[in-house]
């Protein structure tokens, strides 16, 4: 059954346009509450945690959701602005029925969204989301006054999460002598991430820590690393750490201003665990993970498999394989031996631990990995065009793949949101990659 409201990462859209409107949010809270109470044990009181990022619309959506949950007889614990992975952690640690995050991650402030975590700190299953959607078809009601849900504020939510993050860093190590610039994207980590690194001994220079409700991800954070690069150079810092608006993505910068994306950091995490004798089995990347990273990880003597783009699919394949480490170039990095979901702060701590234990810089940890140039062309499509049925196009794709052999990779996929065909070619030569990509793209009939 196809879902009507839930996408790959919850429900998301522009504030003020359906479904990101108060009336629907109240219905959503009520529907989710009804599903939770149906699954609860007899006489068990359901309680959910609601966290949010720093968007001004968070207040509006939080109040609407709270009303819906209360009407369904579910207690609500409010923790204010906190990273998405912080909600996952607290939901599990406090033995709650579910966690709710109000955030649109790396999107601009005009957007917002809702996603749910299970009692175990995992993203909700498709079946649970379908059950919520089915309940949304019913009219909203209200339990008796005696059964109404109550609202509480969890005042020490940030402190609890900070301590959890610190607990994932090896106890025999510290960050003394390290000068870090931390960019929190004017988002949810503005009052958590700097404290984590400072309390572990680092000298911390913070940017992107002045949220006003409208400046989240605005020229800062993991999706706009230029500000971090400039600050690292200006301060003569050893390293820069950039998170996105809800702090589940990570990008890092070394002292020279070189940017390291999620692909490269994924290799660092995998190699460090292998060097420490940990049994990994393998690593999960995505369809877009650079071929050089795949080759380097396989060179460690472990497996490598690709999931569809999106941290949800990486997590699904990790669980399917029973593996621990996965991620994607955008900076979603999963360390399931540390947390149940992707966490930018915790991933940064794991990279810092690898640097400390090896007494090497990030560049030195990656000096044997040469990232392949990757060319991505977006070609506009006619509405009726089916590229998979185009014999001429597919013949050229096959020819390019044969020419590249094992020294390159071709990926063709239609955009899920726009009338575009994405043509990606990567190989050791940028010129070869560009020519190969053009030879395919030029055969696509455009409007």
UniProtKB/Swiss-Prot annotation:
It catalyses: alpha-D-glucosamine 1-phosphate = D-glucosamine 6-phosphate. This is Phosphoglucosamine mutase. Its cofactor is Mg(2+). NCBIfam families: glmM (TIGR01455), PRK10887.1 (NF008139). Activated by phosphorylation. Catalyzes the conversion of glucosamine-6-phosphate to glucosamine-1-phosphate. InterPro entries: A-D-PHexomutase_a/b/a-I (IPR005844), A-D-PHexomutase_a/b/a-I/II/III (IPR016055), A-D-PHexomutase_a/b/a-II (IPR005845), A-D-PHexomutase_a/b/a-III (IPR005846), A-D-PHexomutase_C (IPR005843), A-D-PHexomutase_C_sf (IPR036900), A-D-PHexomutase_CS (IPR016066), Alpha-D-phosphohexomutase_SF (IPR005841). Pfam families: PGM_PMM_I, PGM_PMM_II, PGM_PMM_III, PGM_PMM_IV. Keywords: Isomerase, Magnesium, Metal-binding, Phosphoprotein. It comes from the Bacteria. GO terms for biological process: carbohydrate metabolic process; peptidoglycan biosynthetic process; UDP-N-acetylglucosamine biosynthetic process. The active site is at residue 105. Mg(2+) binds at residues 105, 244, 246, 248. Binds 1 Mg(2+) ion per subunit. Belongs to the phosphohexose mutase family. GO terms for cellular component: cytosol. Gene3D superfamilies: Alpha-D-Glucose-1,6-Bisphosphate, subunit A, domain 3 (3.40.120.10), Alpha-D-phosphohexomutase, C-terminal domain (3.30.310.50).
